[in-house]
Amino acid sequence: MKVPILSRLRSLSSIDRNNEEKNVDMEHQVSLDFASAPNSPTVNKSDKNNKHDKHDKSGEKAPSTPKITTTSPPSPSSSSSPSPSSSTTTSPTTTTTTLSGSDSVSKKSGKTLSPTTPTLKSTLSTSSMKSTPSGSVKNTPRQTPRQTPRQTPRGSMTPREGGSDQFESGSLSPIGETYLEGEGYEESPKSSSFFSKFISNTFSGFSMDAAPETVVTSTPRQQSRPPSAQNTPNFTSQGGSRSTSRRQSAIQL
């Protein structure tokens, strides 16, 4: 739809320019006619006056002086009074209106078409930059380095395998229970409730991340699970409690 609109605007602008040029030519001709016609009687009158002055005054030197005086006023009167009135009133108005009209058409067409492209570019750039790289780049480095130290120091791998299977099935609540039953309460039964809470939090956080294979393969689950991204700073702040719980487990073993 944009191409026919532009072609129509161009055709209209060309037609308007042709009409305006014709009008300007006609006005110039009319102004020339007005400038030539009314000046002729004035010139004739001045010549008649000069002749009368010549007849009245005697001598050769006398007619030379009135020529200078009488011929000088008609020249500014003929050039200034009729011609500028016609030329200044008609031509500048038409030229200004025509130029402004053509410029307005071109400016309007430029204004209507130009802002559409930068908006599309800006929206595409912002959406692409915000959606794809942030989701992929931020999630992968968080998952890969944190899973390796969690899995290496702990000896028993049986509850983790069960947790990964349950994570694939979709039930998140019993994972924390299996971890608490498997490691937390068996390794430190004499610990206070304060440490047991931290241990439960650490195991529940690990259950959210689960195994690397399941998390990487299930891309829609990463997008649909905001708590994993929200809980990551909490886990970083609980690093001290993790180290203490790991030391206690190592001492008990």
Swiss-Prot record:
Ranges of biased composition (kind: Basic and acidic residues): 17-30, 45-60
Example of a GO biological process term: sorocarp development
Domain of life: Eukaryota
Region annotated Disordered, chain positions: 1-192, 212-253
Positions with biased composition (Low complexity): 1-14, 63-104, 111-154, 236-253
Start-end of Polar residues biased regions: 215-235
UniProt name for this protein: Putative uncharacterized protein DDB_G0284619
Organism ancestry: Eukaryota, Amoebozoa, Evosea, Eumycetozoa, Dictyostelia
